[in-house]
């Protein structure tokens, strides 16, 4: 029987076609599921929320000043007691919150409200406990707190009209430096 003539390039061509059938879908899956790059945090307009809050607030509001352009304001919210809060639930008290991302991308948050101090402090400090030591910043006395897992540190200031909590996953030195930038903005009459 005569041997059939074979094209010597057929085996190579078939191998390349088989590889393409396998590699192309894998590359498409990798491309589809890979992240498109780092997203920059969305800046929020703290001044707009602060303006509204100072008209409605029954207590002086704290806001950071002079942080520098590397700090990004990423949260600003105000709600009167009973109005929708950022959680979608009614605010339990007159509530002010502002948060910034540091140049190291650590979130530094300030929460301030009147009423229900114990539950508020427990929530804002991630169920933290006092660790001793007081700090003076923004014309207030602040007590140091640390969360149960030791990750989050907080400064708590209980005033006559309100309670304020500054919290971050940072050491107390950085937290106190942030608290030193806070200034009180009086409510408008």
Which functions belong to the PLM regions below?
Residues 15-32, 67, 89, 98-100, ...:
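Generic hydrophobic secondary-structure signal
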Residues 10, 54, 87, 125, ...:
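Residue-identity detector for threonine
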Residues 1-79:
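Charge-rich, low-complexity N-terminal segments
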């Amino acid at each position: 029987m005569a041997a059939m003539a074979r094209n010597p390039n057929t085996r190579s061509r078939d191998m390349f076609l088989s590889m393409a059938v396998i590699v192309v879908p894998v590359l498409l899956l990798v491309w589809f599921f890979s992240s498109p790059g780092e997203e920059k945090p969305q800046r929020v307009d703290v001044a707009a929320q602060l303006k509204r809050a100072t008209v409605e607030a029954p207590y002086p509001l704290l806001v950071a000043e002079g942080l520098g352009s590397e700090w990004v304001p990423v949260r600003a919210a105000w709600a009167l007691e009973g109005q929708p809060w950022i959680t979608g639930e009614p605010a339990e008290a007159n509530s002010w919150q502002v948060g910034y991302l540091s140049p190291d991308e650590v979130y530094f948050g300030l929460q301030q409200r009147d009423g229900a101090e114990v539950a508020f402090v427990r929530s804002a400090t991630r169920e933290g406990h006092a660790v001793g030591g007081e700090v003076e910043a923004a014309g207030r006395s602040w007590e140091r707190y640390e969360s149960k897992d030791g990750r989050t540190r907080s400064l708590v200031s209980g005033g006559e009209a309100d309670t304020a909590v500054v919290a971050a996953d940072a050491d107390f030195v950085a937290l106190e430096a942030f608290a030193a930038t806070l200034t009180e903005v009086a409510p408008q009459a």
